[in-house]
């Protein structure tokens, strides 16, 4: 068994499992709690603890969490080299290798993100049941101001129909549009097959992940 360890955002679970099967990765795989998404500081602390507690013979720790909320900035490779995707967030991870330009002012979904939304305070289905459709629509228009374009990222690892059925009521509330975009998640293949190029951040043992590793990457932009 490999002495490599993966710690991944749970929203990438199906895609990562597909890459594991394709590459034959045989190391440890751990999925982080979805609750960490709402607290970058806690995400950072949890990741650092996992790194610090890795076995002395660990060859590499692969962190499938990117620049999300700067949660990975400052991570110290105390026990083993680190490898991370050079991306702003999980959306960029999923779009990597597809050749698609990330649309501005857009909301992106997969089944993983749908499940995250359902468990959050922004679950429109729950809000409709509690407040009614009209009050929910008013609230959502305030929350999603500037965002009307929705994209389902089709990574061909799940059925997109339930995602469409879930999100369409929200799209209609916002007078928005729903489109599909292809997701190749190529950087996950690079992380697992050992490719270390410009798309991968490599931190040697004893090093620290500096914020400059994300220079040139563009955060989400609200459409004018």
Locations of regions flagged by a protein language model:
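Gly/Ser/Thr-rich loops at beta-strand to alpha-helix junctions
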Residues: 7-14, 36-37, 61-73, 88-89, ...
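Short, charged, surface-exposed secondary-structure boundary motifs
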Residues: 37-43, 91-98, 162, 190-191
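N-terminal basic/disordered segments at the start of proteins
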Residues: 1-23
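Short, well-structured alpha-helical segments in soluble
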Residues: 45-57
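C-terminal accessory domains and tails appended to enzymatic cores
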Residues: 182-224
């Amino acid at each position: 068994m490999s002495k490599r360890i993966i710690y991944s955002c749970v929203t990438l679970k199906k895609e990562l499992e597909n890459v594991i099967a394709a590459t034959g990765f045989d190391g440890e795989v751990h999925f982080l709690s979805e609750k960490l998404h709402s607290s970058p500081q806690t995400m950072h602390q949890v990741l650092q603890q996992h790194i610090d507690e890795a076995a002395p013979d660990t060859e590499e720790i692969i962190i499938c969490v990117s620049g999300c909320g700067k949660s990975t900035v400052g991570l110290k490779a105390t026990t083993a080299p680190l490898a991370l995707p050079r991306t702003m967030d999980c959306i960029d991870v999923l779009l990597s290798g597809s050749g698609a330009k990330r649309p501005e002012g857009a909301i992106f979904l997969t089944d993983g993100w749908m499940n995250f939304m359902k468990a959050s305070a922004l679950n429109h289905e729950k809000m409709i049941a509690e407040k009614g459709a009209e009050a929910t629509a008013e609230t959502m228009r305030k929350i999603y101001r500037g965002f009307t374009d929705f994209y389902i990222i089709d990574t061909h690892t799940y059925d997109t129909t339930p995602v469409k059925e879930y999100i369409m009521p929200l799209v209609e509330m916002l007078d928005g549009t729903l489109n599909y975009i292809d997701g190749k998640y190529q950087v996950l293949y690079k992380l697992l097959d050992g490719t270390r190029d410009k798309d991968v951040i490599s931190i040697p043992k004893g090093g620290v992940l500096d914020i400059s590793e994300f220079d040139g990457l563009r955060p989400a932009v609200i459409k004018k």
